[in-house]
Regions:
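C-terminal regulatory/effector modules of DNA-binding transcriptional regulators
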Residues: 77-179
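Long amphipathic alpha-helical segments
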Residues: 1-102
Length: 179
């Protein structure tokens, strides 16, 4: 399908405005991190929430931000304190949006998702977001958090028939731990 010539400049302007908005938000969030400025983070986040869903903000802004922060951290441009500061503010937003969903009963009851990180695993931001997405889709979730002893998961089998365990590892578990 051809686009009318008069629509092309409008489309170009929309694309430029969207990229500019994302770039501005990313820069504001990086500045908030560098200055440990929670207020700037919250103002930037609230401004984004006026235009986008939480899922859009996470995918379009937070993920690129975290990718960039990873590079900054690996090159010693930022300290672990900077990374922890911004990660905890993002976690706070995930918790808030997840809690809003938890007031409603799950609509999909055929599966229960149990989310956990194994012992010595502390990087939970991604798992928290998966928990949010599963709850958003109407599933019952049980979030167990970080450094969960794997042998303790067997208890859950007494309570639910169709459990899906969700985890990931950035530390290397032994084969015996996985079995």
């Amino acid at each position: 399908a051809k686009m009318g010539e008069e629509k092309i400049p409008v489309l170009v302007n929309e694309i430029i405005a969207e990229k500019s908005e994302k770039s501005h938000a990313l820069n504001s969030l990086k500045l908030a991190m560098l200055n440990f400025d929670q207020s700037l983070f919250l103002r930037t986040y609230n401004s984004l929430m006026e235009e986008k869903s939480f899922t859009q903000i996470f995918n379009e802004v937070f993920i690129p931000l975290l990718n960039e922060l990873g590079l900054l951290w690996q090159t010693n441009t930022i300290s672990p304190a900077h990374e922890h500061f911004i990660s905890n503010l993002i976690k706070q937003k995930i918790y808030i949006h997840t809690e809003k969903l938890q007031f409603e009963a799950p609509t999909k009851k055929d599966e229960v998702f149990v989310l956990f990180l194994p012992e010595n695993e502390i990087h939970e931001l991604g798992l928290l977001y998966i928990n949010y997405q599963l709850a958003l889709q109407g599933y019952k979730t049980i979030y167990l958090g970080r450094t969960m002893p794997i042998e303790s998961l067997e208890d859950l089998l007494k309570y639910y028939n169709n459990i899906r365990f969700v985890s990931y590892f950035t530390v290397a578990p032994t084969k015996d731990e996985i079995d």
